[in-house]
């Protein structure tokens, strides 16, 4: 098959989105062999090439039409879009789907000993960040004047090194901030991974493949957030038992062999079934309660 007929997907080579991007593609049926030092992987069962690059490069590859699809954090995508716009360009792309991983937030943080009342406390401060465009937009919207200190890494050490008075950096758990004697005071941007497509139209063959992948991505995400529940229930308690089950679609009710008083319920729940709910089900007479993960799902 000619190279230009193969779908090109850019993902992060290393970092917080890399592993989960590969897992998502694998769960969508894309078979590939990833070698640690290799920058490109070829699918063995679909006409797909996986480009493993720096996350900062993925938006540009999409904007310029070099690759067809990309998995990228919204924070990196928007930072790069704002950067291009600041240069007078008009970058474009198609947002196909927000994904269920890579959650983080871009936040302002101060040294623990500094008091914080409101955003005016940042007036005139020197703020270290790797996201100058997102910070600039937020501060402009809130009428705050500040001094920018651009760093490409280790932003959290800037106050301790007297490079800045505060920072604007990504936060997941907050452990890194705490380890550097910093406190998160204001979230300025919420982010997660997303799947994007270049703006230019794809060939019919590529678009058909993208549509197939999107159907599978939706199925994988639905399966991840769903559980398959099986239990036995007294016929006389069916209404009460169904009312206890969170996010359940219409259940399948099956007769039990040699048992006239009970039935089997099979159902898909879009919410986790906690121990408290299982105990409440048991109190209403349910038994043999099984909660199972779902590997794949298509509606």
Swiss-Prot record:
It is found in: Cytoplasm. InterPro entries: ATP-PRT_HisG_long, ATP_PRibTrfase_cat, ATP_PRibTrfase_CS, ATP_PRibTrfase_HisG, HisG_C, N-reg_PII-like_a/b, N-reg_PII/ATP_PRibTrfase_C. Catalyzes the condensation of ATP and 5-phosphoribose 1-diphosphate to form N'-(5'-phosphoribosyl)-ATP (PR-ATP). Has a crucial role in the pathway because the rate of histidine biosynthesis seems to be controlled primarily by regulation of HisG enzymatic activity. It catalyses: 1-(5-phospho-beta-D-ribosyl)-ATP + diphosphate = 5-phospho-alpha-D-ribose 1-diphosphate + ATP. Belongs to the ATP phosphoribosyltransferase family. Long subfamily. Feedback inhibited by histidine. The gene is hisG. HAMAP family: HisG_Long (MF_00079). Its EC number is 2.4.2.17. It is an enzyme of class 2 (transferase). GO terms for molecular function: ATP binding; ATP phosphoribosyltransferase activity; magnesium ion binding. The keyword Lyase does not apply. Signal peptide: none annotated. PANTHER family: ATP PHOSPHORIBOSYLTRANSFERASE, ATP PHOSPHORIBOSYLTRANSFERASE ATP-PRTASE. One of its GO terms (cellular component) is cytoplasm. PROSITE patterns: ATP_P_PHORIBOSYLTR. Keywords: Amino-acid biosynthesis, ATP-binding, Cytoplasm, Glycosyltransferase, Histidine biosynthesis, Magnesium, Metal-binding, Nucleotide-binding, Transferase. Pfam families: HisG (PF01634), HisG_C (PF08029). GO terms for biological process: L-histidine biosynthetic process. This is ATP phosphoribosyltransferase. Pathway: Amino-acid biosynthesis; L-histidine biosynthesis; L-histidine from 5-phospho-alpha-D-ribose 1-diphosphate: step 1/9. Its cofactor is Mg(2+). It comes from the Bacteria. Its main location: cytoplasm.
